[in-house]
Amino acid sequence: MKNMTKLSLITLALAASSSVFAAPKTFVYCLEASPSALSPVLSTDGASFDVNALPIYNKLTDFEDGTTNVIPSLAEKWDISEDGKTYTFHLRKGVKFHDNKEFKPSRELNADDVVFSINRQFDPNHPFHKVSGGNYEYFIGMDMQNIIDKVEKVDDHTVKISLKVPNAPFLANLAMDFNAVYSAEYAEQSLKAGKPERIDTNPIGSGPFQFVDYQKDATVRYKAFENYWQGKAKIDRLVFAITPDASVRLAKLQKGECHAMPYPNPADIENLKKDPNIELMSQSGMNIGYLALNSSIKPLDNQKVRQALNHAVNKQAIVDAVYQGAGQVAKNPIPPTMWSYNEAVQDYDYNPEKAKALLKEAGFENGFDTELWAMPVSRPYNPNARRMAELIQEDWKKVGVNAKIVSYEWGEYLKRLRQGEAATSMIGWTGDNGDPDNFLNTLLSCSAVEAGSNYTKFCHKPFEEVVLGAAQESDKAKRTELYKQAQVIFKEQAPWITIAHSTVYFPVRKEVKGYVMSPFSLHNFYKVDLADK
C-alpha cells in the first residue's frame, strides 16, 4: 500500500511537471492590414479592433458570442430610469488590470476607470482629450457627445450616466469597442511621467490578453493574462501576422504558418471547401460595400450627377465578377438581414442612356473628369476593390465620365477619406451593434461629417431628423417606420452607389477549436483552443 502511494505520488509529480513544461500554445492569425492605431478609441476599422480592442479591453456591456444580444460585462447589472435618460451601472468586483515594465497597478478596476474612459472622449477639457491627436471619430460619429449629458461616480462600484435625450441603442453602443474601459491609474502615471500617449501606444487593459509588442507592418504579439476575471485563455500566446495579400494569407494557412485568416479570394472558396485540413466557416454578412460620392466636391454636389453615376454602374456584373457567387446586389444602406430593411425601395437600374440624360440635365452633357479611390486591402464587404474600380471606370467611361483610379496604404487611405480628399471612394461597413442607427447615423448623419466617418459629407436635414428621431424612440415598430423613411430619402439623394452585401467566409485549420463567428465580422480568440495534431 505504501509502495502504491509512492507510485501515485511520483505519477502525479510527473504529470504536474509535464504540464508545467508543456510547450506553450501559440495561435497565429493572418491579419489583413496593419492596425491604424493600438487604441480602440482612435480606431474605426475592423482590422484595428481585432488587434487593439478584443484582446486587451473590456466594456461595460458586451455581445453574446455569435449574436447581437447585449449581455453584462464589466457592469454586472444596470438600472434604467422610467424616462430612459438615466443609466446606473453596478460594476463587477475583482477585475484586475495588466501590468508592464512601466506600470504595476495598485488597485482593481473601479468607477474611476469608467468615468475616465468616457470623459476622455466626451469632455474637451479633459487632460487626455487631445492626447494622440484627440480624434474620436467613432464616438462623434455615433453622436455620443449629443446623447450623453454627464458621467458620475456614485461609489467605487457604481457609475451613473445621464443622457440629454433617450437613446434606444445606448446599451448596444456601450458594447462597441470604442467604449473600451482604460486604466485611469495608468493614465495618471503616464501623464506625470510626461508620456501621456503611452496609454495608446503601450496599452494596458483588463482583457484576456496582455500586450507584448508591435513590429510595424509585421506582427502584433500578446500573452494570455493569468489573472483575467473570466479565467485564463486556453491559448498561451496570440500573434497577429500582418498579411495584406489574400493569396499569401491562404498559402500561410495551408502550410500551417497561421491558424486562421479572413477574407479569402472568392476564386479560392471551392478549393478551400475541399481541403481536408481546413474548416471553411461562413455566414451572411451584416455589411454593405459602397462607393461614396463626396457632395462637397463639384460636380458631385449635384443630385442629378449622383443619380447619373448610379444609373451608369452595372452592379450585377460587378457582383458576378468580384464576389463570384458570394454576394448580392445592394439597394439600401443597411443589409437585408437587419430589421427595418425597406423592401419597397426601388434601386437605380443599369441604364447608361438615363445616366447620359441626367448628366445633360445637370449641365455635363460631355461628362467630366474625376478620381475613383480603391481600397488597398480585402474587406468583408469588398474582396477586390481594384478589380471593382476597373469595372466602374469602364462603366463610367461609356457615359463620358473619366475616372482616374487612386489608392494608398490602408491607414493613409482612411485618413485621407476622413479629411474629405476623395471625390469618389470605395469603402464599406460591417455593423457593430445590430441596430440600423449604426449604419444610418454613423455613416450618413451630419454629426458623422464632423467625426469623419461620413465620407460623402452628406448632411441632409430631412434625413437627419428622421434618423435622430428613430434613435430617441423606444417603440420598435415606430423606429422601423422611421428607418424605412430614411432609406427612401437616402435613395433619392444618392450619396452612395450601393454595391453589394457579401457572404463572409472564415477559413480555420482543423486543429482550431471553440471559435465562434461574430455577426460583426470581428475576431475574438479568447475561447479558442488548439487540439493536438
Question: Where are these predicted regions, by residue range?
Answer:
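Detector for C-terminal structural segments
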Residues: F27, V51, Q215, A312-S340, ...
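N-terminal lobe/hinge region of extracytoplasmic solute-binding protein
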Residues: C30-E82, N119, H126, I204-G205
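A structural "hinge/loop" feature
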Residues: S34-D50, L74-A75, K101-K104, F170-A180, ...
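Aromatic- and charge-enriched surface segment that lines or borders ligand/interaction sites
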Residues: E76-P127, K160, P299
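Surface-exposed binding/hinge segments that line
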Residues: D123, P127-A187
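Ligand-site clamp/hinge motif
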Residues: E197-D200, F225-N271, A389
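A bilobed periplasmic-binding-protein/Venus flytrap-type ligand-binding module shared by bacterial periplasmic
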Residues: K223-E226, G285-A308, A312
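Structural transition elements
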Residues: V329-A362, R379-R387
